[in-house]
């Protein structure tokens, strides 16, 4: 860790949060599906599929982070997100949309808590874990600003159409993937209870609830 630049790592995590949550199609997916002719019943079923897939993969996604590391898990999350958007562009019926929605849920699960855990481990590696609350506060602010901006762009997404809107999400997803791959992996930090560190702050829980509503 002698050449580890904690400031650069934290700034990359801030940038990753900002880029990751600017998803104009993801923020307006219900309206986009309605625009494509899907009924309210079908949209409700698709949202149920999202939550079911999210519940089924919640524990396995945590195992992935513990076994393969936070950095690889974040990168995989961004890759799955890009594939989900691509699947949505190519979808032409209820079944293919459901497949894309399930992939989106897996992406959310892989990312959920992983950025926070990597930030905490990074700060702990340089004995600055007391700065984690400051990081979490700033990260939550960036998340809210970015996700709100994406929501405000819902009209733009509807004007562009679902294919172009998801293409924009893919563009930002690829940037996020590049940032995730450039992060420094931190390993070997175990919490006081003998478990790998994985901070679950109130801010993170609020963010997770907001994500599942999108």
Ranges and model annotations:
Residues 1-10, 183-214:
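Juxtamembrane intracellular "pre-TM" segments in multi-pass secondary transporters
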Residues 2-56, 89, 214:
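Helix-loop boundary and gating motifs at the non-cytosolic
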Residues 18, 84, 95-111:
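Hydrophobic core of transmembrane alpha-helices in multi-pass small-molecule transporters
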Residues 35, 88-90, 147-168, 172:
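Transmembrane alpha-helix termini and helix-breaking/packing motifs in multi-pass membrane transporters
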Residues 51-59, 144-148:
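Residue-level signature of mid-helix packing/kink "hotspots" within the transmembrane helices
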Residues 79-93, 97-98, 181:
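C-terminal ends and interior cores of transmembrane alpha-helices
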Residues 102-143:
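Cytoplasmic helix-loop-helix junction between adjacent transmembrane helices
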């Amino acid at each position: 860790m002698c050449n580890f630049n904690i400031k650069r790592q934290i700034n990359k995590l801030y940038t990753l949060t900002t880029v990751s949550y600017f998803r104009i199609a993801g923020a307006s997916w219900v309206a986009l599906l309605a625009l494509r002719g899907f009924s309210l019943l079908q949209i409700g079923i698709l949202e149920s599929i999202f939550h079911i897939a999210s519940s089924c993969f919640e524990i396995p996604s945590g195992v992935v982070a513990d076994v393969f590391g936070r950095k690889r898990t974040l990168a995989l999350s961004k890759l799955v997100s890009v594939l989900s958007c691509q699947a949505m562009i190519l979808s032409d019926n209820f079944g293919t949309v459901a497949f894309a929605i399930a992939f989106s849920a897996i992406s959310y699960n892989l990312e959920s808590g992983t950025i926070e855990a990597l930030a905490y481990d990074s700060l702990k590696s340089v004995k600055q874990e007391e700065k984690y609350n400051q990081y979490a506060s700033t990260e939550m602010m960036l998340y809210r600003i970015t996700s709100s901006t994406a929501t405000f762009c819902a009209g733009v997404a509807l004007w562009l159409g679902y294919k172009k809107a998801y293409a924009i999400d893919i563009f930002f997803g690829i940037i996020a993937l590049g940032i995730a791959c450039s992060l420094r992996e931190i390993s070997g930090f175990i919490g006081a209870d003998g478990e790998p560190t994985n901070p679950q702050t109130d801010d993170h829980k609020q963010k997770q609830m907001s994500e599942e509503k999108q």
